[in-house]
């Protein structure tokens, strides 16, 4: 085959047929239609985009014009910060009370209100007082009739006192040197600051009556001083020896020395207690003397304890001369106490003798309206209080005031025929001591502290909240009874300091969490003059706690501690050798004194 023939054959083979040409034309038409459809859709989307942009621009312009109109011609609004609304009950999280930036003492203050109270009592010693101020005793520089809550008496700021006694009309105190300080309307109506009166006698304790002050000196002398400055100036002033040899002169004020003259060798007066008209003098050898203690009235309700002794039958000599209570001879009397018109004496064996007025049952004997006076010491029946309880009672303390009497009792558990000797629980109870407190007398103002308002209570009534208390002692690893450290009784109210475990050894050398704490103290009874210190006027028939004395400092402490208000109670500072605010080192403790319609807590020493 020639080359020309081959070329024609190849050309013929490459030439498409009619079916192939038709399919090609159809495909080209489809592609052309698809391209036209895509261009149409793109055109529509572009048109929609232009319309959207126009709408947004129009809306923005309208908003700008509105903002321009609202903001007084300014396109930019002037913003002001607004505080968020406060929640009704916001959730407060307590922060850590110990902060590295705080000192050791600041951290301890935040940890414990009790530690703060103890520290403040050392830094700022003085006197807090409250109650009736009709005689300007509680607040000498104020004309307020009552002081509802504890308030400091500025004169005593920084001072330590040996003793203090308060009547609604006059007050008396002994400073650290043993000098007598007096104030109040009953002393001088125009004097609004305490005055030092009897000096140089080294007084250690005080007792007051209707219008006189009895001061006991360190050497055992008993001085009877008029409460009134006028009487001090007008009554006979005794001769006094001077430190200059062979030189003597009259005292600056009038007073009487009523120390018994027939004391034995080495015997001296160790304690004095007084009512409105009488006083009891206890000697170091357990003897008891009684004497009249008011200037204008002689005791007539048997409170002297000497049968038949009256103003008409009194022996020759001074009206206030002491008389030995011979009925108590042979009993070693350890403590004495006086109410307004009655007397109590406790001997070393735990027996109590009572005499005087029994109109409210304050002697603990059955009430007899035909014979309300007992003029000789009589033994208080005690066994019936523990009848059938397998306990042996022993009275450990007596206190009295107004028309009330109080006793504290240690009751020891003993074996009885009813006990099962094989019961180990019974064996553990043998020898267990329970400390109880009883009250008797007038309860109409709540002084019985038993939740009742009894007019006459002749049988001693147990005070539930001050009886049968125990705590764990870490030093002895045992449970011990909580007794009363001190009981102060006023005319219608009382206060008790508990003998619970206290601690005052926290120092720079102990741990950061080591804090001091004081003793519990409670108040109860009449409150008509706000003498309980609660800030309210209702009487209390149950012992109650008070707020801390220095509430201003307590509020500041609470703000640093938790940032919120905290509720704490007053704890009284126990005896300790401490550094005071002025740098002095002294034995000091806080003491409570209930008087006639008023109360005081003071920094005591000696």
PLM features: residue spans?
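Short coil/turn segments that connect the beta-strands within blades of beta-propeller domains
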Residues: 124-125, 168-169, 177-178, 210-211, ...
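Conserved core positions of repeat-based scaffolds
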Residues: 129, 170-173, 182, 212-215, ...
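Short glycine/serine- and acidic-residue-enriched loop/turn motifs that recur at repeat junctions
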Residues: 70-123, 127-149, 181-199, 223-256, ...
């Amino acid at each position: 085959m020639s080359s020309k023939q081959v070329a024609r054959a190849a050309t013929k083979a490459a030439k498409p047929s009619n079916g192939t040409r038709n399919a090609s034309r159809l495909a080209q038409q489809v592609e052309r239609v698809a391209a036209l459809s895509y261009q149409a859709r793109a055109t529509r989307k572009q048109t929609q985009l232009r319309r959207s942009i126009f709408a947004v621009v129009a809306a923005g312009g309208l908003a700008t014009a509105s903002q321009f109109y609202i903001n007084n011609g300014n396109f930019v609004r002037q913003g002001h910060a607004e505080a968020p609304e406060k929640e009704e009950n916001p959730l407060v999280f307590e922060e850590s009370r110990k902060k590295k930036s705080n000192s050791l003492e600041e951290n301890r203050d935040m940890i414990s209100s009790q530690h703060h109270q103890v520290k403040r009592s050392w830094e700022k010693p003085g006197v807090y007082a409250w109650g009736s101020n009709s005689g300007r005793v509680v607040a000498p520089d104020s004309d307020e009739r009552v002081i509802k809550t504890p308030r400091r008496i500025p004169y005593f700021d920084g001072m330590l006192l040996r003793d203090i006694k308060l009547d609604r009309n006059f007050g008396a105190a002994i400073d650290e040197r043993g000098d007598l300080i007096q104030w109040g309307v009953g002393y001088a109506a125009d004097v609004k600051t305490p005055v030092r009166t009897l000096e140089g006698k080294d007084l250690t304790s005080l007792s007051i009556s209707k219008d006189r002050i009895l001061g006991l000196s360190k050497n055992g002398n008993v001085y009877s001083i008029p409460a009134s400055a006028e009487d001090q100036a007008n009554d006979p002033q005794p001769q006094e020896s001077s430190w200059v040899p062979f030189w003597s002169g009259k005292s600056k004020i009038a007073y009487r020395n009523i120390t018994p003259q027939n004391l034995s060798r080495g015997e001296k007066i160790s304690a004095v207690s007084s009512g409105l008209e009488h006083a009891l003098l206890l000697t170091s050898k357990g003897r008891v003397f009684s004497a009249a203690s008011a200037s204008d009235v002689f005791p007539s309700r048997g409170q002297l304890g000497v049968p038949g002794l009256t103003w008409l039958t009194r022996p020759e000599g001074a009206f206030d001369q002491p008389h030995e209570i011979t009925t108590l001879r042979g009993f070693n009397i350890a403590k004495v106490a006086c109410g307004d018109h009655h007397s109590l004496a406790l001997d070393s064996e735990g027996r109590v003798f009572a005499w005087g007025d029994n109109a409210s049952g304050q002697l603990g004997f059955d009430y007899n309206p035909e014979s309300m006076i007992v003029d000789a010491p009589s033994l208080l029946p005690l066994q019936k209080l523990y009848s059938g309880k397998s306990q042996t009672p022993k009275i450990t303390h007596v206190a009295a005031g107004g028309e009330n009497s109080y006793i504290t009792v240690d009751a020891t558990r003993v074996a009885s025929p009813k006990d099962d000797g094989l019961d180990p629980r019974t064996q553990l109870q043998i020898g267990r001591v329970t400390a109880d407190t009883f009250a008797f007398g007038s309860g109409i103002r709540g002084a019985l502290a038993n939740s009742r308002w009894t007019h006459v209570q002749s049988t001693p009534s147990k005070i539930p909240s001050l009886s049968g208390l125990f705590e764990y002692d870490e030093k002895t690893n045992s449970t011990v009874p909580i007794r009363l450290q001190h009981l102060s009784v006023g005319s219608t109210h009382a206060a008790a300091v508990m003998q619970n475990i206290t601690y005052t050894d926290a120092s720079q050398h102990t741990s950061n969490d080591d804090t001091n704490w004081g003793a519990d103290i409670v108040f109860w009874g009449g409150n008509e003059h706000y003498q309980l210190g609660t800030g309210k006027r209702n009487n209390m028939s149950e012992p109650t706690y008070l707020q801390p004395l220095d509430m201003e400092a307590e509020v500041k402490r609470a703000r640093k501690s938790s940032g919120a208000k905290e509720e704490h109670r007053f704890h009284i500072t126990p005896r300790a050798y401490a550094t005071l605010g002025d740098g002095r080192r002294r034995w000091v403790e806080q003491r409570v004194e209930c008087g006639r319609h008023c109360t005081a807590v003071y920094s005591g020493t000696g």
